[in-house]
Swiss-Prot record:
Name of encoding gene: PSMD5
Lineage: Eukaryota, Metazoa, Chordata, Craniata, Vertebrata
Keyword annotations of the record: Acetylation, Chaperone
Signal peptide: none
Subunit-level organization: Interacts with PSMC1, PSMC2, PSMD1 and PSMD6. Part of transient complex containing PSMD5, PSMC2, PSMC1 and PSMD2 formed during the assembly of the 26S proteasome.
Family stated for the protein in its record: Belongs to the proteasome subunit S5B/HSM3 family.
Full protein name: 26S proteasome non-ATPase regulatory subunit 5
Domain comment quoted from the record: Rich in dileucine repeats, which have been implicated in trafficking of a variety of transmembrane proteins.
Length: 504
């Protein structure tokens, strides 16, 4: 088959209008294993295919792109970088986006290869074209360009090429295209900044991080909403958080939240600002963040009462994030009856809100109630039990009812709540004392789809692996759980058949 492909490739090179040959080559290549093509890589002459891309013929272009995609995979990245550099440069300025995407996918292979990436770094014109691809209308092209530049910047040589040459001017020039492109460049800068303190230093020296932060705290509410997402990404790293604190950005974000009550347009940016603090609290110290920025906790409680489902959803998510570790749980516990009212509200919403918000409420409840075995002190167990009780008059029945609704996502989210409390003795006693609950847990006929079967299996696993389950559920039920566990999530009980003498 590889020989046939090579013969067709030679035919394509020989003819002026080889449309039928391209179709045949495209068809043959689908059947040739990649390892066979690799063995013939030295024989592959791709010049004619690249030349055909310059003809304004839609079908030829589509066929050539597909053929090149396959053949280039058979070539080593170093070979592509050294021998096809002119074709790569032309590909990046081709009017057809599929050609640009093909070219960028090859550049993606090259920058992943430590031997080949040098060829890119030494090609200023190619780097410039990659930068200008960020400004194109096609999002896939822009994303691929951002990914390649981000990968290039992982090395010292890459950082220098991007920030200590004319390329930085090209980057700033591209930013002026429009708002969308400017945000794409910010996205690239944040990706690079997140790698290391040194990378962040290059980005801050360029002035682009400062520009992003200036827009974040500026007057345009829509710009704020976009910029806070990128700043939140930067805050995922320790050095990023340090930088934001040193520059006073965290204090500024807090002050904007304080002033949000008098801003009629605060609903545009407030959810993002609250999310920022939620993530900050979990990554650093919930207690320190909540004590230093009390407006954050205040605003979360306020937003759970909002009639705006966007606000409520973000507040619920943030409570879940905040309560995902013990320190965060204790911070919430200190708010006393206010948090009890919040739990009651979340419990109510998990039953009565639109489906999407129900799921977010259930996820938050799971996060709040989960306690790893090594952290199950008497005080913390009493706390999670009291939280569970605050959710509803009969919370176990509430979640069991939700789990019986015909929405797989809701069903899984309710099972996740049971799984979160499954290793806590007080919850095991509750489950055991509810008539039919143990039977419900080991009944495989309830779950029909894969995600539901997986969720049920996680519940069984959490129960079966608990040290207190045999004592509370009793040995027969414990053995049923162990059997379920050993059979796996997708076990189907074989149907027994009885042979009857004389039956046809």
């Amino acid at each position: 088959m590889a020989a046939q492909a090579l013969a067709l490739l030679r035919e394509v090179a020989r003819l002026e209008a080889p449309l039928e040959e391209l179709r045949a080559l495209h068809s043959v290549l689908q059947a040739v294993p990649l390892n066979e093509l690799r063995e013939q890589a030295a024989e592959l002459r791709l010049g004619p295919l690249f030349s055909l891309l310059n003809e304004n013929h839609r079908e030829k272009t589509a066929l050539c792109v597909s053929i090149l995609e396959r053949l280039l995979q058979a070539m080593e990245p170093v070979h592509v970088a050294r021998n096809l550099r002119v074709d790569l440069q032309r590909g990046l300025i081709h009017p057809d986006d599929s050609v640009k995407i093909l070219t960028l996918s090859q550049i993606g292979r090259i920058v992943e290869n430590s031997d080949a990436v040098t060829e890119i770094l030494n090609n200023a014109e190619l780097l410039k074209q990659i930068v200008y691809c960020i400004g194109g209308e096609n999002l896939s092209v822009a994303k691929a360009a951002i990914k390649s530049l981000s990968r290039i910047s992982l090395t010292q040589a890459g950082l220098e090429a991007l920030f200590e040459s004319n390329l930085l001017d090209d980057l700033k020039s591209v930013m002026k295209t429009n708002d969308i492109v400017r945000y794409r460049v910010y996205e690239l800068i944040v990706e690079i900044s997140s790698v290391s303190p040194e990378s962040l230093n290059y980005c801050t020296t360029s002035g682009l991080v400062t520009q992003l932060l200036r827009e974040l705290t500026g007057e345009d509410v829509l710009v704020r909403a976009t910029c806070i997402e990128m700043v939140t990404s930067l805050a995922y790293t320790h050095h990023g958080r340090q930088y934001l604190a040193q520059e006073g950005v965290i204090d500024q974000i807090s002050n904007i939240i304080v002033g949000a009550d008098s801003d009629p347009f605060s609903s545009f940016y407030l959810p993002g600002f609250v999310k920022f603090f939620g993530n900050l609290a979990v990554m650093d110290s919930p207690q320190q963040i909540c004590e230093r920025y009390p407006i954050f906790v205040e605003k979360v409680f306020e937003m759970t009462e909002s009639q705006d489902p966007t606000m409520t959803g973000v507040a619920v998510d943030t409570v879940g994030i905040l309560g995902s570790n013990v320190e965060g749980k204790q911070v919430l516990q200190k708010t006393g009856t206010r948090f009890e009212r919040l739990l009651m509200r979340i419990g109510h919403q998990s039953k009565n809100a639109p489906v999407e918000l129900k799921i977010r409420c259930l996820d938050a409840i799971s996060s709040l109630l989960y306690l790893p075995p090594e952290q199950q002190t008497d005080d913390l167990l009493r706390m999670t039990e009291s939280w569970f009780s605050a959710l509803s008059r009969d919370p176990l029945e509430l979640f069991r009812g939700i789990s019986s609704q015909p929405f797989p996502e809701l069903h899984c989210a309710a099972l996740k709540v049971f799984t979160a409390i499954a290793n806590q003795p007080w919850a095991q006693k509750l489950m055991f004392n509810i008539p039919g609950f143990v039977e419900y847990v080991v009944d495989r006929s309830v779950e029909q789809d894969k995600s539901s079967k997986d969720a049920k299996y996680e519940l069984v696993k959490a129960l079966a692996n608990s040290k207190t389950i045999a004592e509370i559920f009793g040995n027969p039920n414990y053995l049923r759980l162990r059997t379920y566990l050993s059979e796996g999530p997708y076990y189907v009980k074989p149907v027994s058949t009885t042979a009857v003498e004389g039956a046809e």
